[in-house]
Regions:
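Metal-dependent phosphohydrolase cores
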Residues: 1-144
């Protein structure tokens, strides 16, 4: 286990919670009755502690090695992560093998939308620029 990655995970979860607490305090109408609090405060990204995610993430971000094998292992771990965590928008895309159906975007429940926003916003909290989420979204919106 990596001290650096453990520290990152703790900080990330703390920042996700900080975003949610800010929303609760300043925009309570969007959090009340959402059912999002448990996932955001207690269970966010819990799967990142699973060995098949933890190891590849740790090596990719903190191992100082971006070999083909390391990158492939990370990509597999990322795929596992988004399929285990419904706060990722990719979780809600159904890729069919029937060409007439193609890709179908399913409706994402509101509680996971809140968690997704807090997840994105957590990086703004880390950087100390709470408005950074808007420029990030502007850069990525056409791919989401």
């Amino acid at each position: 286990m990596s001290y650096q990655y453990d520290r990152y995970l703790a900080q990330h979860k703390s920042n996700v919670e900080a975003g949610f607490r800010w929303l609760q305090k300043n925009l309570p109408e969007i959090t009340e009755g959402s059912g999002a609090e448990h996932n955001i405060v207690f269970a966010h990204d819990q799967s990142k502690t699973e060995p098949d995610e933890y190891g590849p993430y740790d090596i990719y971000f903190y191992g100082g090695n971006r070999s083909y094998a390391v990158v492939e292992d990370f990509r597999k771990a990322w795929l596992l992560h988004i399929h285990r965590n419904p706060h990722h928008w990719q979780y809600w895309i159904l890729i069919n093998d029937d060409p007439e159906e193609g890709e179908i975007v399913l409706e994402m429940p509101y509680c996971y939308i809140l968690e997704m926003i807090c997840d994105w916003w957590s990086f703004s909290w880390f950087k100390g620029n709470l408005l950074e989420i808007f420029s990030w979204y502007e850069e990525h919106k056409n791919y989401i």
